Amino acid sequence: MAAVSLDEDLREVVAFRIGSQEFCIDIRAVREIRSWTPTTILPHAPSYIIGVINLRGSVVPIINLAERLGLGSLEPEARHVIIITVVEGQVVGLLVDAVSDILTLPPSSVQPMPKIASETTLSFVRGVITLDQRMLRLLDLIGVLPNVRRMM
């Protein structure tokens, strides 16, 4: 019997909250999870870019993920966390309320988005994961951050 890679068997995701809504991203895109750090504002940046932080000598843009997803804007507070991700080679921080879990799931647990979803939703969300009484949206970071290379 041939060995099957972990990628084909299981998917690991980092689950997090924005308000009462739950989302997740592929763990392979996550570099680290850190507490809120005040940012330096960038003039004329899109409204969902809070600013930048210095992360061990690298300038990292911080995205207000709630605003980017159309859920209103989070006012950064000490209780919030930043998920540092790598998207197409660019390091980007995502401001969220809290990280709740690291989950290991079979690929079959990801269901497609309903066909009635808007084009924007379809470009941001790769699928829906139902887990007990919870429903998590699996985000497509490339869809959420289409201009990641032009942010800096």
UniProtKB/Swiss-Prot annotation:
Q: Which UniProt keywords apply?
A: Chemotaxis, Cytoplasm
Q: Which domain of life is it from?
A: Bacteria
Q: What residues does the CheW-like domain cover?
A: 10-150
| An annotated GO cellular component | cytosol
InterPro entries xref list: CheW (IPR039315), CheW-like_dom_sf (IPR036061), CheW-lke_dom (IPR002545)
Please name the Pfam families in this protein's record: CheW
Question: What are the BP-aspect GO terms?
Answer: chemotaxis; signal transduction
* Compartment(s) of residence: Cytoplasm
Q: What does this protein do?
A: Involved in the transmission of sensory signals from the chemoreceptors to the flagellar motors.
Provide the protein name.
Chemotaxis protein CheW
The gene coding this protein: cheW
